[in-house]
Regions:
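Hydrophobic helical h-region of N-terminal Sec-dependent signal peptides
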Residues: 10-15, 19
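Bacterial N-terminal signal peptides that target proteins for export
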Residues: 1-10
Length: 510
């Protein structure tokens, strides 16, 4: 007769219970992190994982470069534009009546019937099929804007709608778009009134001379564009696209390659516009940093910002700085742009920051950036194709080592032929970043957005929530009254809260 073994039975029950308890002790974030580690050597599965991952905000996105060439072709065809076949530069009509290869100025719509012509446009207006050696990535990249620029003039609303659709597909919650709103009007006014080295005189001259009209023009442009976005996306209707849920704000984009009187006029327009319209949350200075005028006038531009920041201290500033590499400019040109952008230009965020280790006292600067919580907008694909900076040559690991906050960004995703998902993929594969690393970058993007209001986070090292919402963050349940009151008081916190809810939904799949 077989004897029973109650002790063995109890041991099995105990072990089963312990295993279940251990499994339940693993957090959803840990399970999700394990999944990423398990598929890390399978790029297609990693890509699928990252495609669905919530990514927070894209803080460095130029509207003019965000549109894919295929959409630009459509815009140009709608406007009956022509192409200089030799240079691939758009021209106003009338176009040649023929689409033959002999036509020097064919209509852009000829591309719909000629695949070779269509592909020529895409390659000329983007980095597609660009190869190192024939033309530098830097030169090809920046040349695209003068080629397709005419196509964007009348399609701001449609372009914004396209960007938001891409953002929604990438599971972004927020986008800050750089755009020169009413910029031509203020630049022309600056040229008309002329230059004075006395910034106070310049400001009064511009304000009394009609600069407020440029601000009004910019706001009207946003009104028109916003109406088109709502219509194209079906926002507020039963057929609304997911892009309607992406929050968009704008940075006034100053063209720093212009003469000083025009740059000052645009900077002043940016400060005035951001002070008057909540849709515009700050300003930035753009155009290639290594070009002659931006290099010559760099500190002059910083002094302009310093002066106007004193008058408009609430207006946020993000600056392109350190989008440089050895050989592109003389060594001394690499040595101060990031520091001066922060200390003189009052930048709260730095775009690119690739040349940080070429700065004077680079390690001291890194510690200062960490202490002051100056976020760096990391544009991996852009830095590769423009500067050839990638892998170990890129300072992303250095920024992370020194505790400088970082967030991934697309820069000009249409020209680069990339998107935010592939920025995350490049970061994960190149630097072996964990799910938690990527998650915290997404959180940092919203923490350092220029949205108004208090942060959801009391601590951005471990991401502990403020007291009112501390218990709510870890529970995927109805928000407590205290937390809801806090969220109602802050647009920034509401956007961060939405990201946390989307993280919870994403992690529940694993």
């Amino acid at each position: 007769m077989r004897q029973s073994h109650p002790s063995r039975f109890l041991a099995i029950v105990f072990l089963s219970g312990s295993l279940a308890l251990a499994q339940s002790a693993i957090t959803p974030e840990q399970r999700t992190s394990r999944y990423l580690e398990n598929v890390r050597k399978q790029p297609s599965l990693t890509l699928a994982f990252l495609r669905e991952m919530p990514k927070g905000g894209d803080l460095h996105n130029h509207l003019g470069g965000a549109i894919y060439a295929e959409d630009l072709i459509d815009f140009a065809a709608q406007d009956k534009l022509c192409l200089d076949r030799t240079t691939s530069v758009l021209q106003p009509g009338p176009c040649d009546s023929s689409c033959d290869k002999q036509a020097a100025k064919p209509a852009v719509e000829c591309g719909y019937r000629d695949p070779n012509f269509y592909n020529q446009l895409i390659d000329a207006w983007s980095m597609r099929n660009w190869e190192r050696g024939h033309e530098s990535g830097h030169d090809h990249f920046f040349a695209t804007f003068s080629k397709f620029g005419l196509a964007t003039s009348n399609h701001t609303g449609e372009a914004i709608a396209k960007v938001l659709q891409h953002a929604a597909a990438d599971h972004l919650q927020y986008v800050e778009l750089m755009h020169t709103l009413g910029g031509r009007q203020s630049a022309e006014l600056g040229a008309k009134l002329g230059w004075s080295p006395d910034f106070g005189v310049m400001r009064e001259r511009l304000l009394s001379g009609g600069l407020k009209d440029a601000v009004t023009t910019a706001r009207e442009e946003l009104d028109r564009a916003g109406a088109i976005v709502q219509k194209d996306l079906g926002c507020g209707t039963p057929s609304a696209l997911p892009a309607c849920d992406v929050t968009v704000r704008y940075l006034y984009q100053v063209l720093r390659g212009l003469p000083p009187e025009q740059v000052f006029a645009q900077i002043l327009t940016g400060f005035e516009l951001a002070s008057a319209d909540s849709r515009v949350v700050g300003l930035n200075l753009v155009m290639p940093e290594d070009w002659y005028v931006p290099m010559r006038d760099f500190n002059l531009h910083m002094r302009m910002l310093d002066y106007l920041h004193g008058i408009y201290p609430e207006v946020h500033i993000s600056l392109h700085a350190g989008e440089l590499a050895m050989g592109l400019v003389p060594p001394e040109g690499l040595s101060f742009h990031i520091r001066h952008s922060i200390e003189l230009g009052h930048a709260e965020r730095i775009g690119h920051g690739v040349a940080v280790m070429d700065e004077h006292n680079a390690l001291e600067l890194l510690r200062e950036m960490a202490q002051r919580k100056i976020l760096v907008e990391i544009c991996l694909t852009s830095n590769d194709v423009i500067l050839g900076m990638k892998g170990d040559d890129h300072p992303l690991p250095v920024y992370r080592k020194y505790g400088v906050p970082v967030a991934l960004a697309t820069d000009d995703e249409g020209v680069s032929r990339s998107d935010m998902t592939h920025e995350y993929l490049r970061a994960a594969e190149t630097y072996n970043l964990s799910y938690t690393d990527l998650k915290n970058m997404a959180r940092q993007s919203l923490e350092h957005s220029f949205l108004p209001g208090a942060s959801l986070w009391a601590d951005t090292h471990q991401f502990h929530a403020v007291a009112a919402c501390e218990a709510d963050v870890s529970r995927n349940e109805k928000t407590s009254p205290a937390c809801q009151k806090f969220l109602d008081s802050s647009e920034r916190a509401r956007t961060q809260w939405r990201l946390e809810r989307e993280f919870a939904a994403f992690e529940s799949k694993f």
